[in-house]
């Protein structure tokens, strides 16, 4: 049973290499299938992807016309391996934490009724390219964030929830997680550090006004769904919604 990690990327050749290295480091923990979705990159990202795929049989790549991260995530879902049983995501500028799969996968393997595990992330301003961890002395904070990389999901859950909402160009992950936690989905909240989330000027979420707009839209959609269907109730982990000033 394969674990597919969907990695959408657009014009991030250098950080993509670090992200993939962090995944390859964990390939002995699961039968890993790394699916890189190139969202129409215009720089050397496509060349880097080809080199990575040539070097690592775990890597598959699909290229699409540029359409934004939401459509790229859906392209990933459309291209799951026939043997995929578990799914998670990793953004191209983040890195997977060591032992992320070794820690949480046994929970899903031992409890077939659990649809996903949900852990923590560390937000930071700088990743060490050697250790693939936050640089010593860099601003960092462990939080339970609203982030897809914190979730390790059964494919059956993905099938039930469906595709990402392509009307959202941001906060599509918030919307997707809310759609999961609005239903009676059995999950285990863990203390596992799942990934290191890089905050930087080039990050899409740096546009706070736009980010707040789409976050509010995702929350409103959740409220509307629950109002229309009283059986939908929010059963969610305890999310941390605020970052310290040095990480904003």
What do these predicted regions represent?
Residues 21-31:
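Short, acidic, metal-binding catalytic loop of nucleotide-sugar glycosyltransferases
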Residues 83-95:
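Short beta-strand-to-loop acidic/aromatic patch adjacent to the donor-nucleotide binding site
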Residues 2-4, 33, 175:
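Cell-envelope/extracellular polymer assembly enzymes that use nucleotide-activated donors
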Residues 120, 187-194:
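Catalytic beta-strand/loop signature of glycosyltransferases that borders the donor
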Residues 170-176:
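Acidic donor-binding loop at a coil-to-helix junction in glycosyltransferase catalytic cores
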Residues 22, 38-47, 66-67, 91:
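A conserved acidic beta->alpha catalytic loop
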Residues 44, 94-107:
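Acidic donor-binding/catalytic loop of UDP-sugar-dependent glycosyltransferases
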Residues 56, 69-71, 77-78, 101-157, ...:
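Flexible acidic/His/Gly-enriched loops in nucleotide-sugar-dependent glycosyltransferase catalytic domains
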